[in-house]
Amino acid sequence: LDRIGLLVCTTEGIYLPKDRCDQIVHMIRGYFEDTGQELPETLTLEDFAAFFFPGSVMVDSVEDFEGAPIKFPLLTPPKQTQQLSVYLREALPQTVTPMVSGFGAIDLVRTGVNKATGLKDLCERLNADPAGILAFGDGENDMEMLRYAGWGVAMSNAPEVVRNAADEVIGSNEEQAVLDYVEQLLDRLEASQ
């Protein structure tokens, strides 16, 4: 935990090291400053964790968390996220894959585990055809899911590599494009019945 990430996500919960609280809050403030947003001066790590990671647990050491790690989320300076992702791909063992999961966020996950593998598992459990899945995405961590789904839709503000992985590109998150798309789809389905 001291050398890998600021958070550890397991099947049992999300764990935050107590001794890194000030560093984490400082990084969060830097992230929001880089995006032009302000945070209250009284923001604590507990406030942040409760909002972004409900159910998180503060721990004193790596020995205190339970369950097998499934991902290590990293907060990075937004302007350095892509560069850091490239560095991590080269520096980490092949069993770990860095996935850019947002502006200023990288998730370290087991290689071969992604949103598409989650959808595949769900399809197998429900005996569902992936061709019937409509998926939306805007980050590199969505690419495999967009390719796996019967129809993958990327947001216009997604990186080019994500837009290229999709079957269709619609407006941005700021334009509530997903809501509009789903409403239009439901209207078409209703009209066809």
Can you annotate each of these PLM segments?
Residues 2-134:
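Conserved acidic, metal-coordinating active-site core of Asp-based
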